[in-house]
Amino acid sequence: MRAGRSMLCSLFVRDFLLLRPPSPHSPKRSEKDVDQKRNRKTPSWCGSRKRKAARTPYDARITEYAHQGHLVPPRSILKTPEQIVGIRESGKINIAVLDHVAAHIKAGMTTAEIDRLVFEKTKELGGVPAPLGYRGFPKSTCTSINEEVCHGIPADDVALKDGDIVNVDVSTIYNSYFSDSSRMFCIGAVSKEKRRLVDVARECVELGLQEVKPWGFLGDMGQAVHDNAKKHGYS
């Protein structure tokens, strides 16, 4: 919010200074002169020291979004085609690990056993479990049962029971690229209430993903998730 206010204030001051009546003693300036001065003093969105004049159509569009008050990503976080390929390969391993868990998870299994499945499969596929050792985190995955919200730590004394729902959160590093996803599992015969919760959550994910597209807004994704959850009585 603070950054947004700063952006709006700077835009207001800029426009006020440009639109105020000129002093009768100042030399007349053309609109072209005003535009050139504005371009000299406004830094490029990408952080370069070049003048604001857009270098590509992409830069022009980003600059326009910034002028409208939107927060725009710095060029440093934009990925090259090669980086996107690397992230996708890491994601393939991440999904393969979750598929491996799906093939073995069952009632009576401890969450520590799930953790070992994740560790062994990730290493077999050439990856590294990203959580392991991160800021002292002791395990390769996170397991959250029933009402546990997220990031539960696997343990030898926590076993799955028939009727549980459990989220397994997997993060993978492969060739220095990170990927992350989680999956909900229904253990045995779960109640209709739990099944409906899992189904609606998956539907929310799919609707949110439909909003992930070039020139879309991050808020559109969140709004799609929120609207669908609320429609079904969830928050």
Predicted regions and their residues:
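Active-site neighborhoods and metal-handling regions in enzymes and metal-associated proteins
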Residues: 12, 16, 20-235
